From Swiss-Prot:
GO terms for cellular component: apical plasma membrane. InterPro entries: Ammonium/urea_transptr, NH4_transpt_AmtB-like_dom, RhesusRHD. One of its GO terms (molecular function) is ammonium channel activity. This is Ammonium transporter Rh type C. Functions as an ammonia transporter. May play a role in the elimination of ammonia in the gill. It is a multi-pass membrane protein. Residues 44-74, 121-133, 188-194, 256-265, 319, 380-411 are extracellular. It is found in: Apical cell membrane. The chain crosses the membrane at residues 23-43, 75-95, 100-120, 134-154, 167-187, 195-215, 235-255, 266-286, 298-318, 320-340, 359-379, 412-432.
Amino acid sequence: MGNFIQGCKDYFSQQKNTNIRLTLPVVCFVWQIAMIILFGVFIRYDEESDTHWVETKAHDNITSDIENDFYFRYPSFQDVHVMIFVGFGFLMTFLKRYSFGAVGFNFLIASFGLQWALLMQGWFHSLDPQTGKIFIGVESLINADFCVAGCLIAYGAVLGKVSPVQLLVMTLFGVTLFAVEEYIILNLLHARDAGGSMVIHTFGGYYGLTISWVLYRPNLHQSKRMQGSVYHSDIFAMIGTLFLWMFWPSFNSAITDHGDGQHRAVINTYLCLASTVLTTVAISSFSQKTGKLDMVHIQNSTLAGGVALGTAAEFMISPYGALIVGFLCGIISTMGYIFISPFLEKTLKIQDTCGIHNLHAMPGVIGGIVGAITAAAASESVYGKHALINTFDFTGDFKDRTVLTQGGYQAAGMCVSIVFGVAGGAIVGSILKLPIWGDPADENCFDDEVYWELPDEEEEHQESIPPILEYNNHMIHKRQDLSESNFSVEHCES
C-alpha cells in the first residue's frame, strides 16, 4: 500500500513538460471537426433566419421585417459579445507578463465554448422532438455567450497557472455542467434569472474556485515576481472594466421580455452600477491611512453591482432599491479583496488569481438572495395582475404558483448553482490535476513565455522591466499596506 501511495505521489510530482506542440493542435482539430459533424447533424436556422421567412411573414400577417427578432435582439447581442471577448479578456491583463495569455486564451475558450454551448443548450431547451433538430436564432447566440461567460469567470481563478489544453477541457465540462444546471433552475424550478446572477456568476465563480482549490500549488511563491502589475498593464485591465461596466445593462436585459421588462432591467442595472462605483471608491480610500485608491478595487469591485442585480433586474425593485443593492455590493466586494481573499489563500488554500470570489461568487449569491426576496414580496398592487403573471411566467404548469412559493424556488435555484459549481469543480479539477496537460511549473506561472512567442525586445530586455506593483495582487495584499490600513489585521483574522 505504501509503495502505491508513493508511486502516486511520484507520478503527480514529476517534472512539468510544457511542450504542447502535439496535444494542443490535436485537441483543437479533433474538437473542431467534432463540432462540424454535430452541427451538420443537429443545427438548423430557425424560422426567422431561414429563407422561408417570407412565407412565415405572409402566414402570420407580418407586414415588416422589423418584426424579425434579429432587429430587436441584435444590439443587445453585440454588446454582450463585446463583453465576452473584449471585456473579460482585457480585465485579466493586469498581470505584468501574462497579457497574451489573458486575451488570447480568453479568445480561444470563448470560441470553442460558444459552439459547444449552442449544442448543449439546444439539446436541453430547443430540440424539436419531431425532426430531432436544434433551430437557432440570435437569441440562441446570446444564450451561448452567457454560457461561455461562466467558463471565463472560472478562468479568472486559475489565470496563469494552467495550460491552454487544460482550459479547453475545463470549458468542455463547464459548458456541459452549465447547460444542466441552467435547465434545472430555469425549466424545472422555473426560477427567473435574466441576468444570470445564479446561473452564470454563482456557478462560474464556485466552479473556478473549486478547481483552483484542487489544483493548489504550495510553492506558487516561486513565481511571486510575476504576481503583480505594472502601470500599463493596469491601464489595459481598466479598459476591460469600462467595457464591462458600460455594457452590463445590455447583459442583464438581453433576454428579458420585449417592452417594459427590458426597459426596467436597463434602468435598474444602470443605477446599481453607478452606486457601486462611489461605494467602492469610498471603501478603497478609507481602508488606507494615506487615503490612496487600490486599482484592484476599481477594476473589479465597481462591477459587482451588475452581477448582483442580474436576477432581479427585470423585477419591480424600484430605482432606489437598485441603488441600495449597488451600495451594499461595493462595500462587500471591496472588503472581500481586503480581507477574504488573503483568508481564502492562507486558510482554505484557494489561490484565486483574479479575485472572482469577490466579483462574481459573492455578488452572485447576493443577487440570488435579492431575487428571492423581491419575488416573494411581489404583489398585484405593484405589478398589476397581468404583469405579475407575465414577469414571473405564471402560466402552464406554473399557473397556480404564488409569489411566496416563487421566492422559495428562487432560493432553491441559488443552492443548485452552488452545488453544481462546487461538485463539478471538484470533479473537473481532479481531471485537470493529471500530469498530462502541459501545465507550467510553479516558478513559470503567470509568464507568457511558456506558451507564446514573444517579441525579441521583450526577451532581450526582460530583466529591465520596471518593478511590479505588488499591491495589485488579487490574491494577497502587500504586508505594509495591511499594516497601514484603517482595518486591523487582528480584526480580519477574528
